Amino acid sequence: MMRTHYCGALNRNNIGQDVTLSGWVHRRRDLGGLIFIDMRDRDGIVQVYFDPKYQDALTAAASLRNEFCIQIKGEVIARPENQINKNMATGEVEVLAKELRIYNASDVLPLDFNQNNTEEQRLKYRYLDLRRPEMAQRLKTRAKITSFVRRFMDDNGFLDIETPMLTKATPEGARDYLVPSRVHKGKFYALPQSPQLFKQLLMMSGFDRYYQIVKCFRDEDLRADRQPEFTQIDVETSFLTAPEVREIMERMVHGLWLDTIGVDLGKFPVMTWQEAMCRFGSDKPDLRNPLEMVDVADIVKDVEFKVFNEPANNPNGRVAVIRVPNGAEITRKQIDEYTQFVGIYGAKGLAWAKVNDINVGLEGVQSPIAKFLNEEVWKALAERVNAQTGDILFFGADKWQTTTDAMGALRLKLGRDLGLTRLDEWQPLWVIDFPMFERDEEGNLAAMHHPFTSPKDFSPEQLEADPTSAVANAYDMVINGYEVGGGSVRIFDPKMQQTVFRILGIDEEQQREKFGFLLDALKFGTPPHAGLAFGLDRLTMLLTGTENIRDVIAFPKTTAAACLMTEAPSFANPQALEELAISVVKAE
């Protein structure tokens, strides 16, 4: 037998037992004729010592170095009282080695487990990086999450059904990864960006509660929390309303947090998209941050200051204020840095006002814009934002979207910089009632979620007549500023689906070509259905306390969508390309 126990599982209950351990040398120390090692496996670390009493084992141990793969047979001993290590789960015991077997030696490591290695090093030698206890713990947490999800889904009547990986390219927002067909030359499969249409087809097939933990693929620009291939917890239901779907999914996430880290998330508040954007400048607000945006266009619309009065009198403009309690100590240098920061989001500047004494009106205000205000306007502003002595006010004034984006980003930065964001809290919420459509860069209407989302209380005729007023029957789950899941009630009427396609500029010929199978299926007694998808990688990221999604994926890609370990992507074999009838055009 190669193993009787995991290293990290040993405790006082094992004292006096003979055990067989298999794992790696984590650290080695020589002390006065004895050799000590910390031995590690996926479950943790235990101290092992070699005593002259077992000379063969001690002699063999002299050759041990870090990351040798070994087997130990020995006895679990209680540590002396003064040697108990409270920082180790196994710190009350140690193992007296009676036999040592070296499975494999190790070359000098290209990584140093005791120092910060570059991410490039960690990804190139990922198989070594994953030996680190913190990395092993993250992957164990991920496995625990998926195990919990499967149990919950099974207990709630959901069926785990697989959907195809080789499918048809359909417009879902990002570029597809294409797979050439050898049999059908000149044609391509697409790897799925999500199982969206297949799970809707499963509802039409009568499987009223479906789920799947599934790989998805998107060829898009990457960030710290995105990967070209990622994992979704994908869910779809029939005959349930949006609030009923949210209730089930909230119970799942509530239970997941309790099971994984022992945290009770409480009841999730529900907030409309409009409220989230107006108060927090984001459709995924981080409610740990107490700062809010307050609209003041009605107060400043008549001041003789174009920066304020122009957007204040423009239906598409916005003037908003963030009050920072006790922020008057912020220096001019810091204010200049914040002004530069909002410029990234298109803001032309950042007005500010320090409240040195709230009791003396404008006389107590220090601000380059004070000369444009009068006592009446200042009083109204101070009352609107509840200004107090020692506060600073930051003003954003521009187009609605620019002000909202810039001030929303500033809110987050101020919260971090000034220590206002309560990092030890969990703040979940649902965001609902998104706009059905938004304008793309060319000014055309695009679906804010996807083209299969149902509008709220709109007929096809009403939607076609006034699409920009339509509210989507959609919902996102947000935790601490991260969108962890999103879903919607789906369109189940063929006339409504064709109307949405037309609004998006997809003519009837394109509809038949791209979505003919869906439009046909909608004609045969389609049930009302709704669903949601969670990002498993992002959930794991939150539950393990890391800010980099690559830390919770065993073998992730870089931000350039490359695998440094296997050197993928690579050039294809010319013969394989010939069989696929593909010629490669060299980049200029």
Curated annotation (Swiss-Prot):
Binding site for ATP: R218, D219, E220, Q227, E483, G535, L536, D537, R538
Organism domain of life: Bacteria
The enzyme's E.C. designation: 6.1.1.12
Assembly notes: Homodimer.
Family membership: Belongs to the class-II aminoacyl-tRNA synthetase family. Type 1 subfamily.
Record lineage: Bacteria, Pseudomonadati, Pseudomonadota, Gammaproteobacteria, Pasteurellales
Residues involved in L-aspartate binding: E172, R218, H449, R490
GO molecular function terms noted in the UniProt entry: aspartate-tRNA ligase activity; ATP binding; nucleic acid binding
Function according to Swiss-Prot or TrEMBL: Catalyzes the attachment of L-aspartate to tRNA(Asp) in a two-step reaction: L-aspartate is first activated by ATP to form Asp-AMP and then transferred to the acceptor end of tRNA(Asp).
Gene name of the record: aspS
Class of the enzyme per the UniProt entry, highest EC level: ligase
UniProt-annotated stretches for the region Aspartate: 196-199
Organism: Haemophilus influenzae (strain PittGG)
Biological process (GO), any one: aspartyl-tRNA aminoacylation
InterPro entries xref list: Aa-tRNA-synt_II, aa-tRNA-synth_II, aa-tRNA-synth_II/BPL/LPL, Asp-tRNA-ligase_1, Asp-tRNA-ligase_1_N, Asp/Asn-tRNA-synth_IIb, AspRS_core, GAD-like_sf
Keyword line: Aminoacyl-tRNA synthetase, ATP-binding, Cytoplasm, Ligase, Nucleotide-binding, Protein biosynthesis
UniProt catalytic activity: tRNA(Asp) + L-aspartate + ATP = L-aspartyl-tRNA(Asp) + AMP + diphosphate
Protein name (database record): Aspartate--tRNA ligase
GO-annotated cellular components: cytoplasm
Places the protein is found: Cytoplasm
